[in-house]
Amino acid sequence: ALKKAKAIYSMFGSFYMSYNSGPTIEPEWNVKCDIDAARKFTSSGANIIYAGLDITAIVKLDKTKRDKLFMRHSPVTDMLEGLYVLWGNETPTLFDPVAIGMVLYPDLFKTKKVHVSIDAIGNTIIDTTKPANAEVGVYINTNEFINRLMKTYMQQNLER
């Protein structure tokens, strides 16, 4: 069924760096929660583009932008403020918006075709000896991405 999609963009994996942007990969949450499902996903034959920690863990919302969002008081920004309080993270990392950003703003990203598999503990392994089965995000124009995201959040005006 996954092969029917033209492309699947997924916040998934740690290919070249970890949560703290260190050079050692580690099991990423979406993978380690269900390693068997992750293995089926990566081997499905679908056209998968991964937004892994390599491009998501570096996208953070600084205090100035956070305060601007929270002063907006729209349904979306109020929800974001609630999540911020719930997670208790001073500078939230925007993991999932990056995967959506890959679809909306492809000009801000660079990807690399690689072969991805999952090891026994949930590491996402790139094997350069095998043919590519996916694309992995390797670059994001972080500043422009955050600017576009902020503009979207600030302009939305859903009814309450």
Enumerate the language-model features and the residues they cover.
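Class I SAM-dependent methyltransferase SAM-binding "motif I" and its flanking Rossmann-like core
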Residues: 1-26
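Hydrophobic, well-ordered secondary-structure segments
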Residues: 5-8, 34, 38
